[in-house]
């Protein structure tokens, strides 16, 4: 995976948080791209081919597949975990289960407000 990071809900949009990898999009609107759609729908999205995803935001030309997992606090999405791969179809059920477990722990630790 060439990019792993967080987008945090701030001021009505997702804003880039801690990440590892090349510089990424700074902000994403609700419902736009894989991250914004995961936020809007409050569910994990596993995308085998990002180029086939309607409205995909190409922050990096390296991105071929992606998984985005919402971090929930008190029933609301407060952040998303985003992992991008330079290979098609890189993410599977084990990846989803592991990242969702991490997101659940992070949600319980996330500051209120």
Q: For each predicted feature, which ranges?
A:
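Helix-loop-beta substructure at the N-terminus of cytosolic sensory domains
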Residues: 1-15, 113
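Short hydrophobic/aromatic beta-strand element in the GNAT-like acyltransferase core
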Residues: 3, 68, 80
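Anionic group-transfer/hydrolysis microenvironments
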Residues: 50-51, 84-86
